[in-house]
Amino acid sequence: MSEEEPFEFIDQFGEVRRCGSWKVPENFVSSFNTFEGEFPLWTDAQILQALKDPGRRVTRKVLGPEWIPNQGPYSSCNGFAAANAYSRARYFGGKRDGKIFSGSYVYAWVNGGRDAGSALEDSLKEQGIHGNVLLSKCGPSMIYRSQTQKFDTEAAQEKAVNAYAVQTMQGLKTAGAAGFMLIVAIQVGRTWERLDSRGVSGVDSGGGNHAVCCDDYLLLPDGTPVFDCVMDWGTSHGVNGKTYLTEAHFAQTIGRHQFYAIPTGQAGYSP
């Protein structure tokens, strides 16, 4: 993977943030099957039909602020994006016990013993091999294997669901409309923290430095389709720790980072 130094800055609340999602190398081929190769892509009309369904789940009405982690001053966004996707896919797949899993446990498997970021592909592969442990046991500061190996037996009972590599924007929109959890990369800077009156983050210029989980795809009251994103910085940021993203946020990142879709097990897959 294309290892890069994490982007470090002070957020609007004076906390140190490190964004460390690595870009994929040129001609990268994911080890996961592609979403586009496994599922038919929906047309924009079919996607809109799904988003307008009055019975459609609205994640913000189901999952409260306790589902919003704070990765702290570490470059562990890939681990938290993977753990958030697993926690939510598990919940919406029928295991309604409210268990929330640790991104730092996943990150510890892939950071090579230093807090210098990681690649999403590696996080998902290791999550599938080694599993997940509760965030309440393995907190954000536990980012090294010397701290997390004591959880390995327990984590092995919660191995991740299958992931699909998303290659295109139409694939991303189709997966979101079908209820998949999404793992994406965005560029984070000062604009990212500024939400407009609709709750949509500003767009920063760059190829992507922060990985997040989007747990919903929905229409705003003005008809704009948006991806609902877990910011991973606690509930003080955004609206209770979440923000909306549009296609514009991914225009510079979808070719430079590999995106993923995680099935929930109950979404179904038909227009």
Predicted regions and their residues:
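Structured alpha-helical subdomains that flank or immediately precede key functional sites
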Residues: 1-97, 115-125, 129-135
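Acidic helix-start/capping segments at beta-turn-to-alpha-helix junctions
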Residues: 97-112
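Predominantly the structural core of cysteine protease catalytic domains
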Residues: 2-12, 83-87, 110-230, 235-271
